[in-house]
Each structure stands twice: as C-alpha cells, then as structure tokens.
C-alpha cells in the first residue's frame, strides 16, 4: 500500500482488513496464562502532565487542558502542540530499570507500550513521516528502547497504535495553530 505515489509501500502482514482474516488470529500461548501486565502509555502527551488527550483538548476552550496550557505556556496560537513536542526529551528515561521494576516489583508477566498516540507522533525512527521521536524531542527510538528492555527482562512485548482518531484529532486546533 503506497503512502504517496513515489513512496515505498508500507509493510503488509498476514492479515487483511476483514473479520474472516481476523478470526484466523491465534492468541499466543503465553497470553493465556499471563494474568497481569503493564502498559506504558507514555509519549509527548505527558509533557504537560495534564492527561493523554492533551494534544486535542488543549485547543478546546473551557476544558482543564485548555486552561492549563494557557496558564503554563501561553495562548495556543503562539505555543501549540507542535511547540510542546520538542519539550518531550526523555532525558531521565531508563527503560531497563523501569521494565525490571515492572517485572520484579509489580509482578508484570508482559509489557505493552504506546507506539503512536492519536497525536500521530511515532515513537520510533519512522520511515513514513518526520513527526517521530528520532527527529523531534528526545532524538531516541523509544520503541527500540522498550523492546530491548522487555527482551532483557524476558517479558513478551506488545505495541499499541491509536490511529482511530488520527483524521480528526487536531480539528479543534484549526482556530489557533495557523503554522
């Protein structure tokens, strides 16, 4: 599936977008026995500390996130989400230490992490777009760090993608962020 006419096609997998194909999926054996896992829902939406829908709700007048952003960063037309992204630096992030803690202290039997939130910011070195953690913010492949840490700890890894709202996620920003 080409993203653009001259672009490299996206990788395809064993499934097609229909129910019959999805029914052929077999749940991994480890998952049947795993009773507890940790999901790290962490990315640039955490910069402000106001919640995971920050990139959308910071543009919705009257919401807590809108008011929080105005108070701490100024008007959204002058400092929008694109300006928040470079503040996501992950300078104190230690995936080995965190995953070890999740397993040994919390009892996690698997680890999931966020690959891309509704904000369309890829947490890996994406070949399909420049809005990713290698080009903006931490300059690190966050997914690779989590994957290596999970493997080192012997935990199965899952990655979640939240593209369901991607097409309409930034609609509230159109009145503010003109760049």
Regions found by a protein language model. Name each.
Residues 1-179:
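Mature catalytic domains of secreted/periplasmic carbohydrate-active enzymes
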């Amino acid at each position: 599936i080409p993203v653009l006419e001259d672009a490299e096609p996206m990788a395809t997998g064993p499934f097609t977008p229909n129910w019959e194909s999805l029914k052929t999926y077999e749940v991994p054996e480890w998952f049947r026995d795993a009773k507890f896992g940790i999901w790290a829902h962490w990315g640039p939406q955490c910069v402000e500390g106001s919640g995971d829908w920050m990139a959308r709700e910071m543009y919705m007048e009257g919401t807590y996130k809108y008011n929080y952003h105005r108070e701490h960063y100024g008007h959204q037309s002058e400092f929008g989400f694109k300006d928040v992204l470079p503040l996501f630096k992950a300078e104190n992030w230690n995936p080995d230490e965190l995953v070890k803690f999740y397993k040994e202290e919390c009892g996690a039997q698997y680890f999931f992490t966020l690959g891309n939130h509704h904000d369309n910011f890829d947490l890996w070195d994406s070949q399909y777009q420049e809005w990713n953690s290698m080009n903006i913010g931490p300059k690190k492949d966050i997914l690779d760090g989590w994957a290596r840490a999970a493997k080192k700890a012997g935990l199965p890894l899952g990655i979640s993608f939240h593209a369901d709202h991607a097409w309409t996620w930034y609609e509230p920003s159109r009145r503010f962020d003109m760049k």
